[in-house]
Amino acid sequence: MIRYMSALEIKSRPFISSFIVALALTGIVSRDVCGQTKPDSRGAKSIAAIRAVLDAQVSAWNRGDIEGFMDGYWRSPETVFASGDTVTRGWQTVLERYKKSYDTREKMGTLTFSDLEIQLISKDAAVALGRWQLTRGSDTPHGRFTLIFRRTAPGWRIVHDHTSSA
């Protein structure tokens, strides 16, 4: 029997949390290891749903709708956003960070995601790796992101975001 740990249990055990993230990021837990070389229909639907979340985020961002962009994140105090040397915890705090950092349309620019790789690590969890870029009048910041998604009541949501700038 497989026992799934809650996020709180994982968070309280740093070794387990680090181990799970390491597994997810290195791809040790993959469909090939499980003996599946092609995603089944449920897996394909999950990947499509995750892509739809990311597409909706890009659309919201490019409309200047930060709250719409944040709909892709789990509305929980356990949501984590890591960037640079800063870790922000909680959906509301992440929203406030975005609003402070991108308080004008000029600062928001036009967002694109590319080189997306989405891997299911269980029926209710997935990892997405990709590139982001903002096209603005004065510059073009860009970088990489790794997102951990969880299937929640409203659908797939980002529970952990690690974004870096190039």
Q: Can you say where each PLM-predicted feature lies in the sequence?
A:
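Short, low-complexity N-terminal intrinsically disordered segments enriched in polar/charged residues
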Residues: V33-G72, S76, T93
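A solvent-exposed, acidic/Ser-Thr-rich amphipathic alpha-helical stretch
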Residues: A48, I66-I121, Q133, T140
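A short, structured loop/turn motif at beta-sheet edges
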Residues: I118-A126, R150-G155
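Short beta-strand edge/turn micro-motifs at domain boundaries
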Residues: H142-A166
